[in-house]
Amino acid sequence: MINQDTIAAQATAPGRGGVGIIRVSGSLAKSVAEKVVGKIPKVRYADYVPFKSLAGEQLDQGIAIYFAGPNSFTGEDVLELQGHGGPVVLDMLLKEISKIEGVRLAKPGEFSERAFMNDKLDLTQAEAIADLINATSEQAAKSALQSLQGEFSKHIETLVEKVIHLRMYVEAAIDFPDEEIDFLSDGKVSGDLDAIIAQLNTVTDQAKQGSIMREGMRVVIAGRPNAGKSSLLNALAGREAAIVTEIAGTTRDVLREHIHIDGMPLHIIDTAGLRESPDLVEQIGIERAWDEINQADRVLFMLDGTDTIDTDPHKIWPEFMAKLPVGLGVTVIRNKADLSGDVVGMDQNQQYPVISLSAKNADGIELVREHLKACIGFDGATEGGFMARRRHLDALEHAAYHLDTGKAQLEMHIAGEILAEELRLTQQYLNEITGEFTSDDLLGKIFSSFCIGK
């Protein structure tokens, strides 16, 4: 793919630093080098040179490296200027470069987009760059790196190859209608289809783990005032993140903590106690609490174990349960076991899991951690995983649907054309993951979320 514009941007993070890098990509990279550093550096060699304005005034000095396309990150000619990391110096240099006719400032993610368009990496690898930059844990970074190195892509390519081979076999049989009945009962087709379905299920399970690693889980702690919600937040966070007093209604706004459980990102949200209140500020806090509940992956329904022996939230607070979004997972937390005499532990033999604990003494907190991991299906012991996004899971689910539909058609001995079409659709959805078949709108959405200079 030929890009008419040459683009430039700061590749290092904004702000002050020891080193700042300007990246230029496009057919005018050589021209930029001649105008700014006075020569075209030897390919892939670091050259220590002055950086000058178009008028010849020295702005900085540093290292210039030239990469000739297609042997560069973007597949185009690329120039990198590595100078001092002061924002003023970098801004002056970038302004001079953008004055050159045919050169403009890059849009967010445009370098990675060009790398994708020029077949230097596929879409999962491009997305992995952003995921690696945004990783919030060591395990998330490792998973993103695996995707960047093509681990996810290899799984998808293997699946696509097997689907293509089966399509060829099916469509060849369709061309010989006299043999089609024998083909439909051929054990090879059924066996190959079962093998593809099994492999797709394995990849989907791994992708779900990767999605959890990237997205994390939103957990809202909700309940009446003074039930110990903030104490639970502090115990899970391992620090005094929220003010705790004996006064009901101490928490009036939403408090957020971002923690990790064995590498799984967890967004814990403490909310104002839910009750009817004449206080305007508290009312606003309660409205925000419900906003968070409506966006949650799970709610920890906190209750004071000294107030009731019930564990069924529908009996304890039917109005609260009736207002929850349909399908939202709920765990009942019976707090203050140190005062109520409850045995610290977990009971999963009821409609809603019940955990008895003492948030104040941090007794039973590990039960909550393990429970949240189990709720989302996270396996912290998984090694060699890759990062995945919601769109990847959607594509895998669509592919699985069409494979299952094709299998049903085969078992009912319907005409092979229908099976062939289901296999074609399966291949299409799998190709969307790596970008072999992707709409321009989706590409724009993906790359616009990247950093400028990436």
From Swiss-Prot:
Its cofactor is K(+). This is tRNA modification GTPase MnmE. Its EC number is 3.6.-.-. SUPFAM superfamilies: P-loop containing nucleoside triphosphate hydrolases, TrmE connector domain. Homodimer. Heterotetramer of two MnmE and two MnmG subunits. PROSITE patterns: G_TRME. GO terms for biological process: tRNA methylation; tRNA wobble uridine modification. Belongs to the TRAFAC class TrmE-Era-EngA-EngB-Septin-like GTPase superfamily. TrmE GTPase family. One of its GO terms (molecular function) is GTPase activity. It holds the Pfam family MMR_HSR1. Mg(2+) binds at residues 230, 251. PANTHER family: TRNA MODIFICATION GTPASE GTPBP3, TRNA MODIFICATION GTPASE GTPBP3, MITOCHONDRIAL. Residues 216-377 form the TrmE-type G domain. The lineage of its organism: Bacteria, Pseudomonadati, Pseudomonadota, Gammaproteobacteria, Alteromonadales. Exhibits a very high intrinsic GTPase hydrolysis rate. Involved in the addition of a carboxymethylaminomethyl (cmnm) group at the wobble position (U34) of certain tRNAs, forming tRNA-cmnm(5)s(2)U34. (6S)-5-formyl-5,6,7,8-tetrahydrofolate binds at residues 23, 80, 120, 454. It comes from Pseudoalteromonas translucida (strain TAC 125). The gene is mnmE. It comes from the Bacteria. Binds 1 potassium ion per subunit.
